[in-house]
């Protein structure tokens, strides 16, 4: 089927043809035949790079041309940004695109001017909770990566969000995009959707297992030169020599960095100098935007054509790595499986060095087939690679046979809803009541009876959990159940002021309850300055930053840091020294409770160092985390501190101003005195303190700065960017030279250095 045959505007057809899309792939043609452009619901369960995004675009374009609005739901912020950039290419045709991934307690009514809105599932759920005005104008919903219904963390929110959208507008078109899963037909039936199920790919995928000196594919072999001890390094070198790129999936962050260091010394020997000079530019940008030892290690690897990628890196470094790989400068990325979760970074060859993952309950366990297929599916760049290869590594023949049977030749597992637990349901029961989707127990049962969980399981199982959630919400004064004035046999459910606020703040009701109880333990106040209060048990509490930081760290919404053996003494000594700052300390004899409390305190200690401007390098060393982890914990605690401030206001206690102040400090990782400076683009906590200490305490002071003084302080390029960012016109002729750094020069010299053996 040719794209010019489709019932979409001619100018958009021209846009696609100009970009090389003239004929639809077979799964795309099948979707059109099944009614994609006729507002029919559709589930496309097809491999990576088989044209799922085009299906979404066509459905959204058709909806917009008919006066509708489209919502594109993604699981990850990074994927939202990627799709937003792609859809912005439709702007010349009058299609406005917006993105929303941020504040989870805002209505974002301004987004309503757009034709396509890109949002994460959590943000979409938040918009529904906050009564966003344009939500009922949505006529087409695209759900990307719908197989994540199977995820314990993200699945329940995605499932309830889809259910709400279909309830809000029964005529909405749902276009669901999925990996190939075992029960795609069941998912399609739940959605009332036609199913496109296909294994077709534009680039052939060869899945195999390396055993000995050959990759063994079903029915064929490929010999690999064993130049190095590490088989994965040999695969990498083989790929680069054939002008391809590699993704290497590891089981841990440490292994990612370790393999990158090992491989980089070998890869550098076969790269052109021109490429290495360009790599040097990326490496120097990594060094200039990082404060940690990890940044130095990453930069050194990048100089040699290899990078590592995981959640412990800061977002700037992850983007630099991704862009360097897309530009075919970085030849190898060693990554944790997070890279396979949605980002569009295909490669000629995918190497899966470890097929086991650590489980805290069961130790090292084999990964699911679906996870393997997601990683393998990254192999083969459409229109660039003649084929793609995914390779598992086996040490013995038995392991080789097992990997072939259990992964290469296996089908992906069925998807199962994770909604049926009190932890998963609690927040959604509250929001369903607060937002008016249900006002009685029966209406609540009916609403959740339309979920995927109810479609797969017996409804009575769900009703039992819903009743448990209701008892909790009623006990915590977040929901009331009252008799109907006219009919005493009818009981109506209502969200209280507390319940409504908790729902809008997008926190777990258990988190809301813990924060409220914490404030009650600290004590109530009618006003005045902060100081010592007496809690309900008669103990003096001195309210400090740590008091509030620990309060939010004690909630289930906050990810706790693990306790290492070396942490117990340090954290316990801190607790003893600061015992008057905690609203509650468990009895040490209750070992499980006390150990959990210590984990909360350790997490709060990290945040305390963050807001008091301890360097990121020192924090990573003190707490054994990555720079990306610091920012992730800061993001979560900022959101929870905002919630605590709002709840303090509702309760009438005096700590809301302290909480709001901490919220700002957590956002920037600095003291309040730097707030004006850290608001300048490109000025973080470190540069802001350097500027402040040099007398540049405000934007006004910076506007009068001598450019030479500023350049000596932060470097010419940064000085230029700062002044430009605050509206100062600067002659940029002095900022264009970019000399090669000593590290880059050393790398080039090492690469070209001759040894005695070269002359034998």
From Swiss-Prot:
Motif (DEAH box): 144-147
Pfam families membership: DEAD, Helicase_C, Helicase_dom4_arc, HHH_5, HTH_61
EC category name: isomerase
Binding site for ATP: 28, 46-53
One MF term in the entry's GO annotations: ATP binding
Gene3D superfamilies named in the record: 1.10.3380.30, 5' to 3' exonuclease, C-terminal subdomain, P-loop containing nucleotide triphosphate hydrolases
Protein keywords: ATP-binding, DNA damage, DNA repair, DNA-binding, Helicase, Hydrolase, Isomerase, Nucleotide-binding
GO biological process, one term: DNA repair
Catalytic activity: Couples ATP hydrolysis with the unwinding of duplex DNA by translocating in the 3'-5' direction; ATP + H2O = ADP + phosphate + H(+)
Domain Helicase C-terminal: residue ranges: 232-426
Enzyme Commission code: 5.6.2.4
Source superkingdom: Archaea
Ranges where the Helicase ATP-binding domain occurs: 33-199
Subunit and partners: Monomer.
Family to which this protein belongs: Belongs to the helicase family. Hel308 subfamily.
Biological function: DNA-dependent ATPase and 3'-5' DNA helicase that may be involved in repair of stalled replication forks.
Protein name: ATP-dependent DNA helicase Hel308
Protein source organism: Methanococcoides burtonii (strain DSM 6242 / NBRC 107633 / OCM 468 / ACE-M)
């Amino acid at each position: 089927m040719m794209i010019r045959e489709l019932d979409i505007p001619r100018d958009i057809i021209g846009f696609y043809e100009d970009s090389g899309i003239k004929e639809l792939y077979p799964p795309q043609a099948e979707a059109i035949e099944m009614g994609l452009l006729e507002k029919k619901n559709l589930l496309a369960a097809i491999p990576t790079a088989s044209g799922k995004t085009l299906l979404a675009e066509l459905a959204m374009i058709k909806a917009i041309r008919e006066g509708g609005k489209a919502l594109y739901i993604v699981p990850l912020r990074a994927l939202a940004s990627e799709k937003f950039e792609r859809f912005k290419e439709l702007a010349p045709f009058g299609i406005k695109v917006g993105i929303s991934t941020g504040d989870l307690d805002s209505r974002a009514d301004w987004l309503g001017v757009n034709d396509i809105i890109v949002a994460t599932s959590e943000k979409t759920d938040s918009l529904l909770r906050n009564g966003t005005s344009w939500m009922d104008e949505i006529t087409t919903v695209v759900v990307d990566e719908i197989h994540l219904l199977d995820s314990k963390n993200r699945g329940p929110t995605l499932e309830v969000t889809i259910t709400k959208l279909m309830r809000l507008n029964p005529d909405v078109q749902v276009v669901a995009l999925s990996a190939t899963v075992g029960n795609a037909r069941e998912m399609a039936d739940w959605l009332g959707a036609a199913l496109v199920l296909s294994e077709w790919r534009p680039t052939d995928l060869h899945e195999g297992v390396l055993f000995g000196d050959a990759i063994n594919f079903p029915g064929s072999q490929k010999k690999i030169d064993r130049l190095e001890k590490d088989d994965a390094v040999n695969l990498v070198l083989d790929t680069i020599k054939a002008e391809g790129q590699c993704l290497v999936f590891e089981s841990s962050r440490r292994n990612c960095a370790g393999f990158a260091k090992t491989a980089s010394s070998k890869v550098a020997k076969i790269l052109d100098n021109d490429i290495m000079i360009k790599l040097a530019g990326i490496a120097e940008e990594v060094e200039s935007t990082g404060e940690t030892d990890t940044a130095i290690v990453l930069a050194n690897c990048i100089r040699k054509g290899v990078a590592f990628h995981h959640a412990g890196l800061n977002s700037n470094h992850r983007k630099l790595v991704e862009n360097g790989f897309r530009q075919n400068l970085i030849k190898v990325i060693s990554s944790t499986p997070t890279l396979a979760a949605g980002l569009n970074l295909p490669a000629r060859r995918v190497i899966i060095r470890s097929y086991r993952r650590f489980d805290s309950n069961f130790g090292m366990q084999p990964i699911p087939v679906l996870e393997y297929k997601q990683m393998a599916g990254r192999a083969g760049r459409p229109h660039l690679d003649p084929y793609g290869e995914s390779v598992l590594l086996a040490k013995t023949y038995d392991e080789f046979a097992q990997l072939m049977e259990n992964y290469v030749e296996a089908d992906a597992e069925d998807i199962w809803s994770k909604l049926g637990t009190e932890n998963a349901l609690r927040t959604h029961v509250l929001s369903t009541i607060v937002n008016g989707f249900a006002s009685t127990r029966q209406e609540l049962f009916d609403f959740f009876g339309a979920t995927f969980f109810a479609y797969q399981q017996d409804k009575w199982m769900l009703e039992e959990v819903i009743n448990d959630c209701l008892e909790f919400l009623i006990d915590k004064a977040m929901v009331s159940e009252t008799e109907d004035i006219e009919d005493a046999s009818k009981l109506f459910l209502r969200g209280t002021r507390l319940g409504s606020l908790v729902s809008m703040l997008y926190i777990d009701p258990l988190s809301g309850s813990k924060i409220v109880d914490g404030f009650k333990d600290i004590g109530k106040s009618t006003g005045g300055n902060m100081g010592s209060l007496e809690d309900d048990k008669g103990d003096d509490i001195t309210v400090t930053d740590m008091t509030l930081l620990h309060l939010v760290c004690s909630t289930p919404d906050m990810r706790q840091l693990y306790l290492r053996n070396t942490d117990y003494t340090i954290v316990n000594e801190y607790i003893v020294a600061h015992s008057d700052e905690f609203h509650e300390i468990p009895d040490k004899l209750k070992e499980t409770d006390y150990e959990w409390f210590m984990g909360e305190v350790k997490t709060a200690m990290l945040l305390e160092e963050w807001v008091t401007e301890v360097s990121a390098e020192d924090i990573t060393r003190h707490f054994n985390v990555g720079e990306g982890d610091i920012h992730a914990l800061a993001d979560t605690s900022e959101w929870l501190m905002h919630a605590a401030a709002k709840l303090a206001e509702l309760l009438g206690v005096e700590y809301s101003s302290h909480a709001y102040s901490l919220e700002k400090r957590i956002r920037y990782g600095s003291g309040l005195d730097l707030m004006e400076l850290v608001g300048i683009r490109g000025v973080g906590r470190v540069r802001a303190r350097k500027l402040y200490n040099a007398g540049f305490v405000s934007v006004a002071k910076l506007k009068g700065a001598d450019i030479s003084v500023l350049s000596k302080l932060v470097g010419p390029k940064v000085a230029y960017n700062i002044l430009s960012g605050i509206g100062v016109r600067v002659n940029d002729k002095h900022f264009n030279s970019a000399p090669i750094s000593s590290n880059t020069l050393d790398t080039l010299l090492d690469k070209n250095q001759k040894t005695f053996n070269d002359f034998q």
